[in-house]
Curated annotation (Swiss-Prot):
Organism the protein comes from: Laribacter hongkongensis (strain HLHK9)
Superkingdom of origin organism: Bacteria
UniProt keyword annotation of Cytoplasm present: yes
Catalytic activity field: 2-formamido-N(1)-(5-O-phospho-beta-D-ribosyl)acetamidine + ATP = 5-amino-1-(5-phospho-beta-D-ribosyl)imidazole + ADP + phosphate + H(+)
Alphabetical keyword list: ATP-binding, Cytoplasm, Ligase, Nucleotide-binding, Purine biosynthesis
Pathway in which the depicted protein is active: Purine metabolism; IMP biosynthesis via de novo pathway; 5-amino-1-(5-phospho-D-ribosyl)imidazole from N(2)-formyl-N(1)-(5-phospho-D-ribosyl)glycinamide: step 2/2
Pfam families recorded: AIRS, AIRS_C
Record's protein name: Phosphoribosylformylglycinamidine cyclo-ligase
Membership in a protein family: Belongs to the AIR synthase family.
Length: 344
């Protein structure tokens, strides 16, 4: 008689999936908000909108971590990529004025390693705590043959809410407005295909002291900074005209996404010092300065645009919240079809 087969024989371990859910429940519980109705494990997650909003607008975003995951696999460093995952989506919806409400994740692998997946999702919960949003659910997909052993992919989904009258669109930006930059925590989650190419070429000692008490490996894998709480405080105290999350495309390509067509962000390259990690990447990769600005955040993780009379107050408030603030330049009138970010 033909041997009876089970789902486990086919490569899917339901018990491992159940164990993962039990492992992550305490981490998810710490992220809960009063708007969340019920806990993990349902077919859907329920969230109500607070009555403090007169005309609530939901703002959604989704993203991944990109090829930074390849370094996580190679270096067996899975504890912070979850923070990256949350940061990429919550920082995106934040720029339109939204307070993140909840987050969901998708974790896909060929063979579920419970300890590894627990590390990843623990990081996701940490990111949600930093952002003040609830981790209300997710999907763990074990798909034999789809991914190499030890590898996985991640996607995240964030939803936030903003009062309709307070949606930030950038339409009120005018020449003379001030462009502020908030310091990044490193490369964040974009440009890693180039980072990996530079590492391959340079062959550095990744565990040698590099920047203070950090190794080069630590500096490269450092998680994306989450700007939610400081910027929500800023928006509550100072009129913000526009914000840009500096992700793929760097400073050059992301800043114009919030500018009116007739405006240019004129940025002074001397207004901040290129952090040591980016200096190393530029030198070891022989990367042109303009290519650096359109690939990496170069030490600026978020751009904030305010009226000139609000610049000092915004800088003081953000500094008090622990942010490193750089006065990058000014908005000016656009000439013809010139690029809307000029860095010189």
């Amino acid at each position: 008689m033909t041997q009876s087969l089970s789902y486990r024989d086919a490569g899917v371990d339901i018990d491992a999936g159940d164990q993962l859910v039990e492992n992550i429940k305490p981490f998810a519980k710490r992220t809960m908000r009063p708007e969340v109705l019920g806990g993990l494990g349902g077919f859907g997650a329920l969230v109500e909108i607070s009555k403090k909003y007169r005309e609530p607008v939901l703002v959604s975003g989704t993203d991944g971590v990109g090829t930074k995951l390849k370094l996580a696999f190679d270096w067996n460093r899975h504890d912070t990529v979850g923070i990256d995952l949350v940061a990429m989506s919550v920082n995106d919806i934040l720029v339109q004025g939204a307070e993140p409400l909840f987050f969901l994740d998708y974790f896909a692998c060929g063979k579920l390693d419970v300890a590894q997946a627990t590390d990843v999702i623990k990081g996701i919960a940490e990111g949600c705590e930093q952002a003040g949003c609830a981790l209300i659910g997710g999907e763990t997909a074990e798909m034999p043959g789809m991914y190499p052993v030890g590898e996985y992919d991640l996607a995240g989904f964030a939803v936030g809410v903003v009062e309709k009258s307070q949606v930030i669109t950038g339409r009120d930006i005018r020449p003379g407005d001030v462009v502020l930059g908030l310091g990044s925590n490193g490369v964040h989650s974009n440009g890693f295909s180039l980072v990996r190419k530079i590492i391959e070429r340079a062959g550095p000692d990744l565990d040698a002291p590099f920047d203070g008490d950090r190794t080069l490996r630590d500096a490269i894998i450092a998680p994306t900074r989450i700007y939610v709480k400081p910027l929500l405080k800023l928006m509550a105290g100072v009129p913000v005209k526009g914000m840009a999350h500096i992700t793929g495309g760097g400073i050059t390509e992301n800043t114009p996404r919030v500018l009116p067509d007739n405006c240019v962000a004129q940025i002074d390259a001397a207004s901040w010092t290129l952090p040591k990690l980016f200096q190393w990447l530029q030198q070891e990769g022989n990367v042109d300065a303009q290519e650096m600005y359109r690939t990496f955040n170069c030490g600026i993780g978020m751009v904030v645009i305010v009226a000139p009379e609000q610049a000092d107050a915004a800088t003081a408030l953000l500094t008090a919240e622990g942010e490193t603030v750089h006065r990058l330049g000014l908005v000016r009138a656009r000439q013809g079809d010139e690029h809307q970010t000029q860095i010189a």
